[in-house]
Amino acid sequence: MRRRLSLPRFEKNFRERTQEAWAAFSQIEVELRQIIETDETHQRGEELVEKCGNALKTALRDTSFELGFNGEKYELILSPEGLRSRLFPLVYFQKQAPESVLEHWNIWVGRQL
């Protein structure tokens, strides 16, 4: 009987996961905007969070976020939840947002005062 070593399986690095997450977000952002625009009674909040969370989870696991509209642009607000260690990956993620997303969305890290 021969034994084989299996190679360790590494997850993709954060840069690659960030690219994948933005690609996924780009595919659903029109739908997110339509939901935000038409959901006047705020009945579809869970659906919004689920769709957006599924797109972002490739890069950002367990990250809190908010979605909204400020009167001019849609907003995705990523929260470091008071943890400095979460701040730097979120800022990197924010800076990698594609132009196609930034046409319609402001991407923020933390609450803007």
Language model feature labels by segment:
Residues R2-E66, N70, E81-L113:
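Long, contiguous binding/interaction regions
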Residues Y74-P80:
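Short cationic amphipathic helices and targeting signals
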